C-alpha cells in the first residue's frame, strides 16, 4: 500500500497501554496522532521498576511479564519488527494453602510430592485423578452444546469433580491467571474457560507452549514506541470529557481547555471510556457498562514469607490461600521474579498481588494498583457486539477487554482499529490476525453515509 496516498487525519488516542500504544504506533505512519496518558508514564500494565539492590541495578516487571509465540502471534511479530530482544522463561505453578498445610508445585513428581504426606493422602490422589479426567474430557466438553450457557461452577458440579481438584488446583490456577477472586472464577462461563485453557496448552501435561519474557523488562518496547511518537505524547493529561460533533471530536481537559480532532480512539478500560463520553449512545451505555473491573494491589518486595513455606515448591506463579471456607478463602498470587526474568541478582525478588498480609516494611520496594476486567456472562456475550460501536461519531474503542484481557488481546484490538480507521495495514502477515477478538469488516458498514476507509484514503 502507498501510505503517502492516505490523506492524514488528526487523531487522538486516549490511553497508553498496549492497545493505545500499538494503535498510535501504526496510525502515526500516515496520520497526525496525539497520545494522551493520565499517568506520568506510558505503558499501562507494562510497568518496569528499576531499583538499587546492594549496589546493583535491578529492572523488574510488575504487570505484563510473559508471552508465548503460539498465543501471542501479533505481539511476537511486533517485537520482531522493532528488533526487541526476548528470551525463554519458566512458567511453573505452585499452591500453598493455610500457611503451608498443603503445598505442591507442578514441576514434576518432586514438586507434587514435596510434602511427603501427599504420597499417602487419598484426597491428594483424588485431586490428581480428577485433574487427569478434566484434561482427558476437555475436548468433548467443548463440543457439548448443552454447556454453552452454564458457569464453570455449574460445569464442575454437573461433571462430579471433587472439592480438592476444584479448590486446590483448578480455581487457584484460574484466579492466578485472571487476578480474580475464587468466587468470581466459579461464575466464569464454562466454555470460555475451557477454550482459553485449551488454546494456552493448560489442558495437557506435555508439549506446553514455551514462554518468553523481555530482558530488562517491558519498558524496552514502550521506549521504542515512545521514540517514534516523540513530541506527540501528553503525559499527566487528565481529560474531563469527550464531545462528539458532526464534523469531529472535541477533547476538554480538567481546566476547560479544548482541542479539536477528526477522530478519537478510546484505548482505555470500558468503564473509563464510558465515563469520558459526554453523551454516550444507548448502545455505548449498554455495552461499555457490561464490563466490570477488579482492582488489585501489587507489591514489589523481598519478603520471602509471601512464598510457599517449602522452598522446593517455589515456582514462577505461587497461589497462596487462607481460610476454612472454600468459596470465601483469602487468595493471592506471588510471582517469583528471578524465575520469570533474567535479573541481575540472586536475592529473591517477589511481586505479590493482593497478598494475605502486606510485606514487611523493611522489605518493601514499591506498590501499585492494577485494574483487571472481571468477565462474566454478559460481558463475554457483549464482546461479539463491540465492533458495532466502531467509527460512529468518529469514535473508536480498543483494549484488552475486547478479548481475554491479556496483551495479545490489547494489541489485536489496537492494530485492528488502526487498520480500519487509518487505512494502514500492519507490517506483517498472519493467517488470523484478529483470532482472539470479534472484528467485522467496516467496508460493509456505513458511518453517517461515509465509508471509514474511503475517508482515510481521501
Residue ranges and their predicted role:
Residues 1-11, 29-30, 51-52, 380-384, ...:
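Extreme N-terminal leader/targeting segments of oxidoreductases
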Residues 6, 238-371:
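Mid-domain catalytic core of redox enzymes
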Residues 9-35:
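N-terminal Rossmann-like FAD-binding beta1-loop-alpha1 element of flavoenzymes
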Residues 28-52:
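Glycine-rich FAD pyrophosphate-binding loop
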Residues 49-75:
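N-terminal glycine-rich dinucleotide-binding loop that anchors FAD/FMN and/or NAD(P) in oxidoreductases
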Residues 50, 107-108, 326-458:
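Conserved flavin/dinucleotide-binding core of flavoenzymes
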Residues 69-187, 194-195:
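Mobile amphipathic helical/loop "lid" adjacent to a hydrophobic cofactor/ligand pocket
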Residues 195-254, 259:
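Helical element adjacent to the flavin cofactor pocket in flavoenzyme catalytic cores
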Amino acid at each position: 500500500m502507498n501510505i503517502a496516498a492516505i490523506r492524514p487525519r488528526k487523531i487522538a488516542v486516549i490511553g497508553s497501554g498496549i492497545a493505545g500504544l500499538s494503535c498510535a504506533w501504526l496510525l502515526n505512519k500516515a496520520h497526525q496522532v496525539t497520545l494522551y496518558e493520565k499517568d506520568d508514564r506510558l505503558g499501562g500494565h507494562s510497568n518496569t521498576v528499576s531499583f538499587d539492590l546492594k549496589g546493583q541495578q535491578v529492572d523488574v516487571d510488575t504487570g505484563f511479564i510473559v508471552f508465548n509465540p503460539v498465543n501471542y502471534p501479533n505481539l511476537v511479530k511486533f517485537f520482531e519488527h522493532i528488533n526487541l530482544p526476548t528470551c525463554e522463561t519458566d512458567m511453573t505453578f505452585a499452591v500453598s494453602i493455610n500457611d503451608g498445610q498443603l503445598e505442591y508445585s507442578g514441576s514434576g513428581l518432586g514438586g507434587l510430592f514435596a510434602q511427603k504426606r501427599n504420597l499417602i493422602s487419598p484426597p491428594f490422589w483424588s485431586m490428581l485423578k480428577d485433574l487427569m479426567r478434566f484434561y482427558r474430557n476437555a475436548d468433548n466438553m467443548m463440543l457439548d452444546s448443552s454447556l454453552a450457557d452454564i458457569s464453570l461452577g455449574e460445569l464442575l458440579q454437573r461433571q462430579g469433580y471433587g472439592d480438592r481438584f476444584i479448590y486446590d488446583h483448578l480455581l487457584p490456577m484460574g484466579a492466578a491467571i485472571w487476578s480474580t477472586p475464587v468466587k468470581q472464577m466459579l461464575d466464569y462461563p464454562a466454555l470460555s474457560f475451557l477454550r482459553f485453557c485449551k488454546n494456552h496448552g493448560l489442558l495437557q501435561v506435555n508439549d506446553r507452549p514455551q514462554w518468553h519474557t523481555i530482558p530488562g523488562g517491558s519498558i524496552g518496547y514502550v521506549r521504542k514506541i515512545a521514540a517514534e511518537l516523540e513530541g506527540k505524547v501528553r503525559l499527566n493529561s487528565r481529560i474531563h470529557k469527550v464531545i462528539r460533533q458532526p464534523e469531529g471530536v472535541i477533547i476538554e481537559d480538567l481546566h476547560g481547555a479544548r482541542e479539536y480532532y477528526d477522530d478519537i480512539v478510546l484505548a482505555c478500560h470500558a468503564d473509563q471510556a464510558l465515563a469520558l463520553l459526554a453523551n454516550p449512545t444507548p448502545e455505548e451505555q449498554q455495552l461499555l457498562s457490561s464490563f466490570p473491573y477488579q482492582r488489585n494491589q501489587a507489591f514489589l518486595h523481598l519478603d520471602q514469607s509471601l512464598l510457599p513455606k517449602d522452598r522446593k515448591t517455589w515456582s514462577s506463579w505461587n497461589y497462596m490461600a487462607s481460610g476454612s471456607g472454600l468459596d470465601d478463602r483469602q487468595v493471592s498470587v506471588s510471582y517469583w521474579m528471578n524465575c520469570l526474568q533474567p535479573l541481575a541478582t540472586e536475592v529473591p525478588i517477589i511481586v505479590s498481588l493482593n497478598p494475605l498480609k502486606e510485606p514487611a516494611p523493611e522489605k518493601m520496594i514499591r506498590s501499585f494498583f492494577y485494574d483487571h476486567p472481571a468477565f462474566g456472562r454478559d460481558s463475554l456475550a457483549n464482546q461479539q457486539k463491540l465492533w458495532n460501536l466502531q467509527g460512529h461519531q468518529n469514535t473508536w474503542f480498543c483494549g484488552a477487554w475486547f478479548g481475554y484481557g491479556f496483551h495479545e488481546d490489547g494489541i489485536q484490538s489496537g492494530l485492528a482499529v488502526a487498520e480500519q480507521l487509518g487505512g494502514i495495514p500492519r507490517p506483517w502477515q498472519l493467517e488470523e490476525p484478529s483470532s482472539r477478538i470479534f472484528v467485522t469488516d467496516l467496508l460493509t458498514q456505513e458511518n453517517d453515509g461515509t465509508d471509514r476507509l474511503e475517508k482515510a484514503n481521501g
